[in-house]
């Protein structure tokens, strides 16, 4: 069972963007139904547009020079907002997630917006193809599960060693502080931003 997708036009500072987003009430209803059957079922976080994704989109809009003629990959893209902003300036964009439902939603946005330079792929950062490369890696609000921090750090190291520029946004969660501190030696630039009344840190990482 899946929530219906609704086309929304987001009004952001200096730009607008169309995005297919699952109906929030239907998402809640389906989640509570599933929870009655399986108490440990996780909430589908991909169905919501998070402040870190908004901040990433705003940053990319303000810094198109980072994306010009580049190959861009977003991991755990969810609804894909940063990818779709990047597509306005980049050569090619791959927006990926490990959930089929998220991929279906992003593909609907791609078709609606006729984004010929965007592909949507099913990718799990625990099992990335060995040949996968990119010029720029986008990661927004991916450091929310401490159990994933070690694997996530290995993924970041892999792309850093390839010469990839990584742009990462994260809300300032206390539990994520050790993970972010571990990345600071790789940090070339750091910005403090606000989106939806939430403080967001943006890190630009490169070897």
Q: Where does each model-flagged region fall?
A:
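S-adenosylmethionine-dependent methyltransferases
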Residues: 1-207
């Amino acid at each position: 069972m899946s929530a219906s997708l609704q086309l929304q036009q987001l009004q952001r500072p200096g730009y607008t963007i169309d995005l297919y987003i699952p109906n929030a009430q239907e998402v809640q209803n389906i989640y509570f139904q599933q929870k009655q059957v399986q108490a440990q079922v996780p909430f589908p976080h991909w169905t919501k547009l998070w402040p870190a994704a908004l901040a990433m989109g705003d940053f990319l809009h303000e810094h198109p020079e980072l994306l010009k003629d580049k190959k861009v990959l977003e991991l755990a893209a969810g609804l894909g907002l940063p990818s779709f902003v990047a597509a306005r300036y980049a050569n090619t964009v791959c927006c990926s997630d490990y959930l089929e439902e998220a991929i279906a939603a992003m593909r609907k946005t791609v078709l609606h917006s006729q984004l010929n330079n965007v592909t949507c792929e099913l990718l799990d950062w625990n099992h990335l193809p060995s040949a996968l490369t990119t010029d720029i890696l986008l990661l927004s609000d991916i450091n929310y599960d401490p159990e994933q921090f070690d694997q996530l750090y290995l993924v970041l190291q892999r792309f850093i060693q390839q010469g990839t520029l990584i742009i990462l946004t994260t809300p300032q969660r206390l539990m994520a502080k050790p993970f972010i501190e571990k990345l600071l030696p790789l940090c070339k630039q750091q910005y403090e931003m606000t989106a939806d009344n939430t403080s967001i840190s943006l890190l630009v990482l490169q070897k």
